[in-house]
């Protein structure tokens, strides 16, 4: 681990405007000091002065506002005297009258809301009684067998029968059964019908099938008939209420109107299906789509083949590179550069014959010296007064 220098934490004193070591002993020592205590006393006195000044300013402002209000009330009373209006009418009694009027209006609004809620509850109870007889026939559901015959199935008891039960409303179901069959056109131009649930296709028109154009016209007719019947039922209800007819007839009429409204709502629910509308498909469009798919497959296969070929060569294919010197079309410009003939001159070449012989001087040593002189000796140093020269000596002056 490398050594590093860590600074001690410090604390800033707001009263003295100085930095102190951030530990308990140094802080206590600083707070016990005379200078710190004097600074704290000064700060407290300054805060007290400021608070006193603010209180005085508020008192002065309140006095000024009170004087302004008094002057305004005096001017207001003088204006009322000029106009001939009594000042009592504009006093606290007038405010009480206003509050009483506001409370009265609030009570009236509450009463109106309660009346509306009661009327809505009555309408809901009547609708519930009118819808009760309709729940019975909804137990039966219409269906188609694989052979194309219609049968009726009871959702509660689980019974199935070929005969139509009593009170069964098949008109609301016909739109659903018709939507199961889809109309199409073959290559020859003949129309055929395809069942989306069973997958059966027939050349003959199935029972209950309605084309898109006929369906729209029938819906328009149904809506017009429903509007006319609704207007007739409204007029009959008004007559019955005036004459005091029995409530049973009104309930029957409401039930019929509700049935018609359900018939009208059924095609709307069909429109809001999550899979969208059915569309007629022609064989030419199917062929074009198949051809486009085949072309895409061929293109993908060619791409895969090319990728395989490229994978075999890790470095890619070899390419021939041509070195073509680009000739500058512009004319050469004389830049008046210094001549380099002297610099580029070659050094002189010496003509040395190949057969020339080199002569070397020879020196011979006859003897290595006289060995009879004796053993070699070393000279000894001479000392002055028995002392070596390297030692520091005292001067005579001292």
Swiss-Prot record:
Keywords, comma-separated and alphabetical: Metal-binding, mRNA processing, mRNA splicing, Nucleus, Repeat, Spliceosome, Zinc, Zinc-finger
Compositionally biased tracts (Acidic residues): 233-242, 324-333
Composition bias type Polar residues, residue spans: 92-103, 169-178
Stretches annotated zinc finger (Matrin-type): 11-42
Gene3D superfamilies the UniProt entry points to: 2.20.70.10, Classic Zinc Finger (3.30.160.60)
GO BP, sorted A to Z: mRNA splicing, via spliceosome
GO CC annotation, single: nuclear speck
MF terms (GO), sorted A to Z: nucleic acid binding; zinc ion binding
Location within or outside the cell: Nucleus; Nucleus speckle
Family matches, as SMART domains: WW, ZnF_U1
Biased composition (Basic and acidic residues): 126-139, 221-232, 305-316
InterPro entries, sorted: Matrin/U1-C_Znf_C2H2 (IPR000690), Matrin/U1-like-C_Znf_C2H2 (IPR003604), U1-CZ_Znf_C2H2 (IPR013085), WBP4 (IPR040023), WW_dom (IPR001202), WW_dom_sf (IPR036020), Znf_C2H2_sf (IPR036236)
Limits of the WW domain: 134-167, 175-208
Region of interest called Disordered, as start-end residue ranges on this chain: 84-182, 200-274, 300-350, 379-398
Compositional bias of kind Basic residues: 112-125
Summary of the function given for this chain in its UniProt record: Involved in pre-mRNA splicing as a component of the spliceosome. May play a role in cross-intron bridging of U1 and U2 snRNPs in the mammalian A complex.
Assembly information from the UniProt record: Component of the spliceosome B complex. Associated with U2 snRNPs. Binds splicing factors SNRPB, SNRPC and SF1.
Matches recorded under PANTHER family: WW DOMAIN BINDING PROTEIN 4, WW DOMAIN-BINDING PROTEIN 4
Protein name as annotated: WW domain-binding protein 4
Name of the gene this protein is made from: WBP4
């Amino acid at each position: 681990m490398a050594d590093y220098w860590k600074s001690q934490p410090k604390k800033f004193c707001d009263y003295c405007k100085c930095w102190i070591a951030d530990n308990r002993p140094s802080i206590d020592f600083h707070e016990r000091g005379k200078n710190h205590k004097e600074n704290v006393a000064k700060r407290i006195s300054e805060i007290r002065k400021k608070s006193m000044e603010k209180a005085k300013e508020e008192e002065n402002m309140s006095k000024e506002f009170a004087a302004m209000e008094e002057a305004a009330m005096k001017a207001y009373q003088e204006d009322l005297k000029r106009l001939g209006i009594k000042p009592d009418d504009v006093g606290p009694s007038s405010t009480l009258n206003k509050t009483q009027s506001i409370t009265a209006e609030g009570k009236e609004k509450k009463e109106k809301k309660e009346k509306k809620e009661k009327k809505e509850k009555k309408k809901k109870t009547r609708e519930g009684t009118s819808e009760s007889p309709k729940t019975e026939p909804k137990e039966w559901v219409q269906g188609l067998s694989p052979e194309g015959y219609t049968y009726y199935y009871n959702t509660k008891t689980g019974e199935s029968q070929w005969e139509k039960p009593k009170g069964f409303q098949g008109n609301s179901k016909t739109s659903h059964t018709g939507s199961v069959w889809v109309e199409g056109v073959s290559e020859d131009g003949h129309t055929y019908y395809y069942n989306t649930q069973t997958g059966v296709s027939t050349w003959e028109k199935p029972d209950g099938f309605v084309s898109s154009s006929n369906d729209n016209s029938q819906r328009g007719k149904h809506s017009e008939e429903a509007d006319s019947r609704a207007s007739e039922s409204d007029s009959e209800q008004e007559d019955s209420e005036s004459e005091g007819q029995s409530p049973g007839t009104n309930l029957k009429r409401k039930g019929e109107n509700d049935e018609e409204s359900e018939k009208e709502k059924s095609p709307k629910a069909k429109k809001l299906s999550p899979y969208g509308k059915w569309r007629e498909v022609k064989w030419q469009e199917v062929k074009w789509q198949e051809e486009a798919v085949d072309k895409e497959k061929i293109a993908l296969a060619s791409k895969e083949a090319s990728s395989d070929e490229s994978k075999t060569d890790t470095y890619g294919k070899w390419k021939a590179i041509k070195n073509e010197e680009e000739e500058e079309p512009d004319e050469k410009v004389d830049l008046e550069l210094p001549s380099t003939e002297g610099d580029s001159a070659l050094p002189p070449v010496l003509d040395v014959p190949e057969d020339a012989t080199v002569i070397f001087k020879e020196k011979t040593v006859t003897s290595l010296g006289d060995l009879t002189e004796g053993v070699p000796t070393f000279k000894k140093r001479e000392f002055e007064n028995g002392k070596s020269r390297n030692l520091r000596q005292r001067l005579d002056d001292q």
